[in-house]
Amino acid sequence: MKLMNSNKEIIMETGLKVSIYADGADIDTILKIKKNRYIKGFTTNPTLMRKAGINDYESFSKELLNNVTDLPVSLEVFADDLDEMLRQAKILASWGENVYVKIPVMNTLGVPTGPIIKKLSEEGVALNITAIMTSSQVSEVMSNLSIKTPSIISVFAGRIADTGIDPVPVMKECLFRMKGHPKSKL
């Protein structure tokens, strides 16, 4: 209950909303979850798809998009190279108006993806920036996002909590750093 009160305080202080997105790779489960009014969108990634036995990323994604037309659906690039991420992002974005392209805040070598975030955002590609662990990463992301382009900022509060850090103050700081970006959601 304390966490819920803290979230309400955060929302009241910042004017921003915290949204819940269901993460998965099973169409039947997604369709059941879609009926829950608290779910504001869906997200998946290549790892979840692989674990679910999905071999055709494009076919699965397009089936998902055919079934979920009224909520955001985040589809993740699977490349680690920044140029290839950019190429894949443009393809994913072309699959539907409700697609948010998931870009990790950095690649596996620790190279920030800010330049691609900036380019895609300026081109109007809706983005879901993922694997964020710190408020300073949020600041870096926000400096690269166009205020005109919708975005989802995916801070991994659960993983922050797993390190023994209370995620509520971190989330509050992240929301604060998102001010001035009315089309960005946490």
Please state what every model-predicted region is.
Residues V111, K118, V125-L186:
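Catalytic alpha/beta core domains of metabolic enzymes, predominantly
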